[in-house]
Swiss-Prot record:
The lineage of its organism: Bacteria, Pseudomonadati, Campylobacterota, Epsilonproteobacteria, Nautiliales. Keywords: 4Fe-4S, Iron, Iron-sulfur, Isoprene biosynthesis, Metal-binding, Oxidoreductase. The gene is ispG. Its cofactor is [4Fe-4S] cluster. This is 4-hydroxy-3-methylbut-2-en-1-yl diphosphate synthase (flavodoxin). Pfam families: GcpE. It comes from Nitratiruptor sp. (strain SB155-2). It catalyses: (2E)-4-hydroxy-3-methylbut-2-enyl diphosphate + oxidized [flavodoxin] + H2O + 2 H(+) = 2-C-methyl-D-erythritol 2,4-cyclic diphosphate + reduced [flavodoxin].
Amino acid sequence: MKRYPTKKIFVGDVAVGGDAPISVQSMTFSKTADVEATVEQINRLHFAGADIVRVAVPEEEDAKALKEIKKRTSLPLVADIHFNYRLALIAAEVVDCIRINPGNIGSKERIKEVVKACKERNIPIRIGVNAGSLEKEIEAKYGATSEAMVQSALYHIKLLEDLDFTDIKVSMKASDVERTVEAYRKLRPLVPYPFHLGVTEAGTVFHATIKSAIGIGALLLEGIGDTIRVSITGELEKEIEVGRAIIKDAGRASEGLNIISCPTCGRIEADLVKAVAEVEEKTKHIKTPLNVSVMGCVVNAIGEAKHADVAIAYGKGSGLIMVKGEVVAKLPENKLVDRFLQEVQKLAKEKE
């Protein structure tokens, strides 16, 4: 399914929405006022492949630290603001985007001040609705539902539009997948703005990966979503790795290898788990889109190889290397991965 057409905005030099690639972002967990720790985490995220990074700004000292942080990092920076709108005014002087929470940012007058500050620097605002902190009157009317999240988003979108501000992106996050997906589905036909997808408070790696793959993945498959954040408790680099994988496996990016491998069974004569792990580790730097397969026996290996750019078909003590469905070598088991990697590198260079 084609992506929904949305307004393109810019967070720093990263385009979000329109025809821009779906970006991946994360959030530091250091105290933002601790400049050294925050810069170190941002640099880790940069190295891991993040496109955008968000930092918490709960206190004035955090807001004032942003100027030095911005000097020492190159990723676009989003200031995460709750409760105190004055912190947004300080942050807007240096960051690339302001995130406000409609449930706690306060009155129209406060929002007007934030909009004025963002207009002056031509930076966007993310309306970040969170199911755990909805406005009391909206929650009283709609309950803890996806409709409540949608109504909160619509109300604050109109506030910004009435102030002639349309550099907007929207998120609506809950800790349960179904409510999150429902909210995005309902709002998508109603507004033209790019969506930031995520399932909030998703937990540790195992649970967060599953929740995010289901929630974010379902929406991406429907053409919904322009930027994503996979929320994993205390796992910066993993958020980026999982996010990239979700985008790729949802068919929204064609970067890197698509590795097909069998789940193993009693027919396998080789150490397939070790072979696949080695292939993953030694090819993760490759950006060229390739389909490769590493199969443990001939039952499905030949069929998969017909659709793969490069393939290994293991047998007893030996195996085949296949390129574009044709056998190019029969080698002992301990030689297969090295030859496979050579063929992958060769094909990747040819396609660059």
